[in-house]
């Protein structure tokens, strides 16, 4: 893939993720947008690692760590959302004041 195309794709994914994270009112949608942002970061890491130094795999290895963090977030996030739904009967962000009881 050409360097500029990968950066445009990454910027597009990152923009969609940020827009969705800012405008979403549902926790599940916010988690999905966060995954889009993390995938855009991974594309950037791999692209810059390939473009600047092909012999060292620092960007690729760091993207594997980001994927591991995203996998943990994908496992823990829905569990937290389902727990909030059981207690509050809603997954809307503006209705879940967890500090107030």
From Swiss-Prot:
UniProt main location, coarse: plastid
Residue ranges crossing the lipid bilayer per the database entry: 2-22, 32-52, 61-81
Pfam families: Oxidored_q2
UniProt key word Protein biosynthesis: no
EC number(s) reported in the record: 7.1.1.-
Top-level EC class: translocase
Keyword annotations: Chloroplast, Membrane, NAD, NADP, Plastid, Plastoquinone, Quinone, Thylakoid, Translocase, Transmembrane, Transmembrane helix, Transport
Catalyzed reactions: a plastoquinone + NADH + (n+1) H(+)(in) = a plastoquinol + NAD(+) + n H(+)(out); a plastoquinone + NADPH + (n+1) H(+)(in) = a plastoquinol + NADP(+) + n H(+)(out)
GO biological process, one term: ATP synthesis coupled electron transport
The keyword Membrane belongs to this UniProt entry's keyword annotation: yes
Localisation: Plastid, Chloroplast thylakoid membrane
Entry superkingdom: Eukaryota
UniProt membrane topology term: Multi-pass membrane protein
Molecular-function GO term, any one: quinone binding
InterPro entries: NADH_UbQ_OxRdtase_chain4L/K, NUOK/Mnh_C1-like
GO cellular component, one term: NADH dehydrogenase complex
Subunit and partners: NDH is composed of at least 16 different subunits, 5 of which are encoded in the nucleus.
Family note: Belongs to the complex I subunit 4L family.
Role summary: NDH shuttles electrons from NAD(P)H:plastoquinone, via FMN and iron-sulfur (Fe-S) centers, to quinones in the photosynthetic chain and possibly in a chloroplast respiratory chain. The immediate electron acceptor for the enzyme in this species is believed to be plastoquinone. Couples the redox reaction to proton translocation, and thus conserves the redox energy in a proton gradient.
Name this protein carries in UniProt: NAD(P)H-quinone oxidoreductase subunit 4L, chloroplastic
UniProt source species: Phaseolus vulgaris
């Amino acid at each position: 893939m050409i360097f500029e195309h990968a950066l445009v794709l990454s910027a597009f994914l990152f923009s969609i993720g940020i827009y969705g994270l800012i405008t979403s009112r549902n926790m599940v949608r916010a988690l999905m947008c966060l995954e889009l942002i993390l995938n855009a970061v991974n594309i950037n890491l791999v692209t810059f690692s390939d473009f600047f130094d092909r012999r060292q795999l620092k960007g690729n290895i760091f993207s594997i760590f980001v994927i591991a963090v995203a996998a943990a977030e994908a496992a823990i996030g829905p569990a937290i959302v389902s727990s909030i739904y059981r207690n509050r009967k809603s997954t809307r962000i503006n209705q879940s004041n967890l500090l107030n009881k």
